[in-house]
């Protein structure tokens, strides 16, 4: 197996390990940014193909980011007769998603 140099790790790695390492580093930076913004991470969703994303808990900080245009609503769903809005934003190259029962914050 041919190895590639991973700048973030500072060493030679298999190509797939280099990708995973970079994604983990991005998750770490995004989680630190969450802490600075007062956002609580609920879980990480990591699919076989593509980048991981953070599922975060709705809070006033996220509502403010929607109000200022740094985050946006991308859809909605109805659960038990209540409309739930789906929101997202990118931080440090990682997508954050969350659900809210309020459309206009």
UniProtKB/Swiss-Prot annotation:
This is Uncharacterized protein HI_1482. It comes from Haemophilus influenzae (strain ATCC 51907 / DSM 11121 / KW20 / Rd).
